[in-house]
Amino acid sequence: VDEIQLCADPERGHVFTDRLLHARGEQETMFLGAATMKPIIRSLLPDAEFIERPRFSNLTYAGEKKLSRLPRRSAIVAFSAKDVYALAELVRRQRGGAAVIMGALSPRTRNAQVALYQAGDVDYLIATDAIGMGLNMDVDHVAFADLRKFDGVGYRHLYPNELGQIAGRAGRHINDGTFGTTGAAGPIDAEMVELLENHRFAHNRRLHWRNSDLTFQTASALLASLGRAAPREDLSLIRDSDDSRALQVLMADGDILDAAHSPAMVRRLWEVCCIPDFAKTLPEAHHRLLNRVFRFLSTGNGKVPADWIGRHMSRLTRTDGDIDTLAGRISHVRTWTYISNQPDWLDDARHWQEQTRAVEDALSDALHAALTQRFVDRRTAVLYRSLKERRDLLAAVTGDGEVLVEGQYVGRLQGL
């Protein structure tokens, strides 16, 4: 299990804590993550063996820099899609373009954007805090365009470990890295800089937890078992999560309660409530979807009808539209991908798995193309890179008068 420090995350932490406490391999179980977890893991799992892998390169604070003065191979970090787009537009005009990384992108689109950056087609990466996990790139400098983020409740300053997770993307293996700020973020105070440069962060003393030994006798018993108190002081019961809120909403429907008349159907109700809200539009819309899915699974042949899924999927196959439209379609397709991968919800699950995968791939490719078209000026990028390398530019004039510089069209000669 990677990124085990996410046990302390308020939203997802209980999932990681459950794996820490209960997931075990046949021969070995390995948890990877920050050293801040060491004391509490030792307390929870006294027999655990710890192996440390120190960072080989140095991380140094480089202060504030204007966007136009950021070095090549920089990642610029903001915390909203609006800010990411605005920064990417500026970099496109000034430096020829940038790759874009956000949590809303599908893995296929994200990998294509990373490949664009890694290949040197662009020298800048604009990202949300999604850059902090699961991506290894040749980044020399990380610039924070903001030091605050919206966490679903309100705006707050980034915690030291959050800053460290992102700043640590700079440098790789034995190559040193730098971090700093840009735009209106302002400087990082000296105390915080010292923590980040020396990788000194407070230990995690409490982990988020939820009971996973659930009771399925009745829906009410299930809800009560979800709210069971934590067994230790260093485990903190999570506040309402999406799935438990969905359960409460569906339990308010008398027909749903009547259908959940046995432990098997209560378990099925809980499985439906666990469908993630990938689209994150309105909670009511997601709850209506869950309600409909459970009604299908609890009546008739107990399967989700193929024609119903087909109607929904047919609205998502279009690859036109702007960046947000394409990203929205991908998020909706993920819901159907999740449903199609449940073992006994569909008559022809394999068919729908292939269909949803094909649609997501097509939308992901279209989204990558849209991001590249909007945020990469290939002509400017090629010329800027050639000038930075201080080499002579290769220019040519074609037979019909087109002027090409480094293979890029720059104009046409007339009358010569």
Predicted ranges, named:
Residues G25-P39, A119-Y124, M137-F201:
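Conserved segment of the helicase C-terminal RecA-like domain
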Residues V249, L257-L416:
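Extended, charged helical/alpha-beta scaffold domains that provide interaction surfaces
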